[in-house]
């Protein structure tokens, strides 16, 4: 069940990063910044980071073990959400960039390492079933519950129908997500 809740972190960031960055268009001081005008390019840094971080997995698993790698992943989610909450597309754009880089660690160290762990720790006779269960729990149930829960938080703090800037609401939303990810470390 812990995997279901941990997978929610991934759904939170993937579902709301672009609307969050785009919401800065309503703030005059940020409307013409790189972070607003190139939100998709900024978000694509996450994919680059993910591609590079996957290469680190054999090294970190060998040197730190699966428990520490999973802990690093959860702390990376906390950092990613916290940086989103503190950053802005102006002078704080570096926090967004760092958040995109941290995403690779958060995603790969949890999902890929978890899948490798299941592969290495299960008997060959049940390995495919175990992998299937892992995928259902993370990408199926976890993704669904995560998306619904994250939307409830966004709906609570951000008025998506308002033309007024929603920066405070978005910041609070990201801090709630960071707190949630931090609480999962104890599961």
Predicted regions and their residues:
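Loop-to-transmembrane helix entry
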Residues: 27-47, 95, 172
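Short, small-residue-biased leader/transition segments that mark boundaries at the very start
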Residues: 1-5, 187
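Helix-loop boundary and gating motifs at the non-cytosolic
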Residues: 10-26
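C-terminal ends and interior cores of transmembrane alpha-helices
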Residues: 76-89
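Intracellular juxtamembrane helix-capping segments at the cytosolic ends
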Residues: 109-122
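Helix-to-loop junctions at the C-terminal end of transmembrane segments
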Residues: 53-66, 154
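A membrane-interface helix-boundary motif in multi-pass transporters
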Residues: 152-180
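Loop-to-transmembrane helix entry/capping segments in MFS-fold secondary transporters
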Residues: 36, 124-135
């Amino acid at each position: 069940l812990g995997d279901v809740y941990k997978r929610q972190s991934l759904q939170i960031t993937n579902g709301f990063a672009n609307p969050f960055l785009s919401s800065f268009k309503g703030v005059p001081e940020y409307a013409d910044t790189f972070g607003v005008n190139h939100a998709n390019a900024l978000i694509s840094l996450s994919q680059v980071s993910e591609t590079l971080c996957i290469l680190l997995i054999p090294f970190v698993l060998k040197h730190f073990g699966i428990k520490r790698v999973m802990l690093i992943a959860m702390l990376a989610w906390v950092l990613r959400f916290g940086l989103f909450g503190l950053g802005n597309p102006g002078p704080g754009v570096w926090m967004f960039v760092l958040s995109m880089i941290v995403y690779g660690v958060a995603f790969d160290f949890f999902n890929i390492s978890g899948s490798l762990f299941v592969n290495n720790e299960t008997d060959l006779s049940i390995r495919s079933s175990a992998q299937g269960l892992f995928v259902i729990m993370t990408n199926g149930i976890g993704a669904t519950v995560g998306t619904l829960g994250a939307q409830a938080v966004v709906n609570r703090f951000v008025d998506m129908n308002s033309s007024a800037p929603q920066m405070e609401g978005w910041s609070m939303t990201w801090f709630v997500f960071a707190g949630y990810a931090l609480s999962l470390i104890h599961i």
